[in-house]
Amino acid sequence: MWNTVNEQISQAMHFDFKHTIKRQLQSPNSDKLFQLSDGIHQYFVKVAHRSDLERFENEAHNLQLLTKESLFMVPDCITTGANIEFSFIVLEWLELDQQPHTNWHIMGSHLASLHLKHRQAMFGFDQDNFIGPTTQPNRWHKKWNIFFAEERIGWQLQLLHEKGIDLVDKDYFVALIKDMLHSHTVKPSLLHGDFWRGNMGFIQSVPSVFDPSCYYGDREVDIAMSELFAPLPDAFYIAYNKHYPLTQGYEQRKLIYQLYPILNHANIFAGHYLTEAKQQIELLLK
């Protein structure tokens, strides 16, 4: 496989690349991560099963879109490819700062700047993509409440149902989510889609994001996600609200929006995430 990777990097970069250093990195999921270098040029390589090529191609498309539309530093996609057994994506190597940062206010203002661009009239995306390893359907909808209820919550509940797990009556709960979001006025914003601390950082103090799951939706989804697993520093939220204030009712909607990543984790990992999903559903049923 590594000969294929070397060849595709060479074709993409227009010079002969042959790695002399291959260092495996810690991975938060089933993807295998590597730092590849010839002593001069460095690249970040993700490797997975051949069937994951579509996921890597989606990631490349999402990164290119964020590069075009946002102020964030986003890694360039060098190439994607596959052999008989494996698929891979090669990204620009970006060295994340290790020290604690005081530039979270810039991260917040950059996200607000992205969300303020309302260039799409409908909710969805031009292709389905992935959140982690899970397929994320993005059929276009005119109404946000229908999109989120069906393409996000309903989809995740259906995936659980296919595993023999029913946390709630799916049809009833999807109808409830539609009703709860019915009166919420939304202008579609381009979302990162998986905006939590593990998918962002700083490079020489400049805010950077990666591993996106982009679509056009309610900007509050990105904010709610950022508060779920490891909330960001207050400076981030203060700066975001200064540039693009959140509207009344966000705290209630946050519970709805956070259910989506919780359900996704329940589908991927099961365990205590199933309990957490059940508890979140019960809160929304009250």
Where in the sequence are the language-model features?
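Short helix/strand-capping connector loops at secondary-structure junctions
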Residues: 256-265
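Conserved N-terminal boundary motif of the eukaryotic protein kinase catalytic domain
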Residues: 16-23
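ATP/Mg2+ or Mg2+-diphosphate-binding catalytic cores
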Residues: 265-286
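An alpha-helical support segment within catalytic cores of ATP-dependent transferases
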Residues: 2-13, 119-190
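Active-site Asp-x-Gly
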Residues: 137, 144-149, 158, 187-190, ...
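Protein kinase-like catalytic domain
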Residues: 67, 115-119, 244, 267, ...
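ATP-binding pocket architecture of kinase catalytic cores
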Residues: 23-26, 30-142, 146
